[in-house]
Curated annotation (Swiss-Prot):
It comes from the Bacteria. Binds 1 Fe cation per subunit. GO terms for molecular function: iron ion binding; S-ribosylhomocysteine lyase activity. HAMAP family: LuxS. This is S-ribosylhomocysteine lyase. The gene is luxS. Fe cation binds at H54, H58, C128. Keywords: Autoinducer synthesis, Iron, Lyase, Metal-binding, Quorum sensing.
Length: 172
């Protein structure tokens, strides 16, 4: 099985909260797609609650689009990581990490301004696969923690696992 880019970096050295450019690729038409690792919690140390991350999934995707989309950037998707330590964001364009961090901060402030669980978009059985698994309170606690901690930048060069270690860890 091919080794995915996200598994070539040392998760034990990742800072959180932090932004990292996980991958860049070119489309056949020449557009650049950038995938960002938006790490909310330190891997293997903390985990986002099920209800909190699910509620953030509904809120964060819209708020990030409000703050980041523009003439040179269009968000394709923001999805929670299976490990529940953050989100992956794929977009067309190449915004710098600090621009993404600023949009993330503004989005967390927006989460804190949501007044009622009934204001969570697509919170119904027709548009959500587990519409009863939400907590605005838990989402706000996550947002508060992000704002209190601030957002750093993780660089792939600083986190790259040595080739020898990748071979040693490989499951054939």
């Amino acid at each position: 099985m091919p080794l995915l880019d996200s598994f070539t970096v040392d998760h034990t050295r990742m800072e959180a909260p932090a932004v990292r450019v996980a991958k860049k690729m070119q489309t056949p038409k020449g557009d650049t797609i950038t995938v960002f690792d938006l790490r909310f919690t330190a891997p293997n140390k903390d985990i986002l609650s099920e209800k909190g991350i699910h509620t953030l999934e509904h809120l964060y995707a819209g708020f990030m689009r409000n703050h980041l989309n523009g003439t040179d950037v269009e968000i394709i998707d923001i999805s929670p990581m299976g490990c529940r330590t953050g989100f992956y964001m794929s977009l067309i364009g190449t915004p710098v990490e600090q621009t993404v961090a600023n949009a993330w901060i503004a989005s967390m402030e927006d989460v804190l301004n949501v007044e009622d669980q009934n204001k969570i978009p697509e919170l119904n059985e027709y548009q959500c696969g587990t519409y009863t698994m939400h907590s605005l309170e838990e989402a706000k606690a996550i947002a508060t923690a992000i704002l209190a901690a601030g957002i750093q930048v993780n660089k792939n060069d600083d986190l790259a696992l040595p080739e020898s270690m990748l071979k040693e860890l490989s499951v054939d």
